[in-house]
């Protein structure tokens, strides 16, 4: 029986936006993946991540964003691994726990350019399939790729979570950059924080 081809889309999703969703949608419909798992990365105590939203909020926003599309799944798998967690450890644990699945690591071309700096990068490439999606300003020479690495011909989405956070912080109405349920939840969260702050001032 063929294994379920499962893309691991790991990120902070701080917050998740339509660029993330459209990319994952493309990879399922045009690149042969059966499912995409949004692997929300936890706060790393060894890094300065002052602008990182709480783990549970980011997880909840992804869940809201993917509801109704059966080929997407949100995962808190890395929340339960020792920190700092490394990609090689995550992939090995996933393969142990889900032997019926063929996991493929989804990364941007910007990350591929510095992939040799990743922990155990050679093992990751030799033992796993990697699906690289294009990022603006980071073109990949396909003729130089290892056999396990494939570059997707997906559209380039020039939206960043940093842009989303900065726009929200300045009161911009950017509802069409986010899934409606995500936008609604963020506005509720912001109103709650503002109300709490005003009660204490």
Curated annotation (Swiss-Prot):
Biological or metabolic pathway of the protein: Cofactor biosynthesis; NAD(+) biosynthesis; deamido-NAD(+) from nicotinate D-ribonucleotide: step 1/1
Catalytic activity: nicotinate beta-D-ribonucleotide + ATP + H(+) = deamido-NAD(+) + diphosphate
SUPFAM superfamilies: Nucleotidylyl transferase
Molecular function GO terms recorded: ATP binding; nicotinate-nucleotide adenylyltransferase activity
Top EC category: transferase
EC annotation from Swiss-Prot or TrEMBL: 2.7.7.18
Pfam families in the cross-refs: CTP_transf_like
Keywords: ATP-binding, NAD, Nucleotide-binding, Nucleotidyltransferase, Pyridine nucleotide biosynthesis, Transferase
CDD domains: NMNAT
Keyword match Phosphoprotein: no
Superkingdom in the source lineage: Bacteria
GO biological process: NAD biosynthetic process
Task of the protein: Catalyzes the reversible adenylation of nicotinate mononucleotide (NaMN) to nicotinic acid adenine dinucleotide (NaAD).
Family to which this protein belongs: Belongs to the NadD family.
PANTHER family attached to this UniProt entry: NICOTINATE-NUCLEOTIDE ADENYLYLTRANSFERASE-RELATED (PTHR39321), PHOSPHOPANTETHEINE ADENYLYLTRANSFERASE (PTHR39321:SF3)
Name of protein: Probable nicotinate-nucleotide adenylyltransferase
Gene designation per UniProt: nadD
